[in-house]
Amino acid sequence: MALKYKRILLKISGEALGGEKGMGFDEPTLDAICGGVKKAHELGVQIGIVVGGGNFWRGRSSGKMERTLADKIGMLATVMNALAVSDKLEQLGVPTEVFTSITMPQVAPAFTRKDALRAMDEGKIAVFGGGTGNPFFSTDTATALRAVEVSADVMFKATMVDGVYDKDPHKYPDAKKYDTLTFTKVLEDQLAVMDGTAATMCRDNKLPILVFDLADPDNIARAVQGENVGTLVYEG
């Protein structure tokens, strides 16, 4: 089957790496997720990955800590996750290169668009850590930013649900799943796709978002080939 997308930016939440508990690294889960990424990579698609940090730290739950400091700790958590994902992919025989938005040359080179594109053109998966490098911005926004910067065809948001619903499907059995959505409806109805900053950036740059379930990591390869997976959000 032909590829629907030639270059994707994949967002993986930190909690996903933690397995059922959502904390730390769950080795079987990490194996499965990276195995799914490998299958997509073998199809010939160029891949960039942004990883969240919620399996180690959530700035919004940091109590009385000053928000800027809490977010900096969260950025460091995403770097740890980027290194772990990169290492697992390398173990599976997939070449990678890690880039950080925070200057830490002993760990990984700083992100530049030129270097990220060079890595992907060389067949490597570019793994981005450190969020945007600034407080008050989510890793969803970091994913949207990197996707726009590297001219990705689509942003993949791999989650714990199989798409976007009109209300929480875990709480409401009658929740309706959308196959497609416009950014206008997402923003007007405040649907739980991502924060408004990220959604607006994608809308303004005509970057579609595909939201799908990571419980089956093969969904990544299916989505790359254009199979009916998850919910597609686009600028209608």
Where are these predicted regions, by residue range?
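C-terminal catalytic "cap/lid" subdomain
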Residues: 1-236
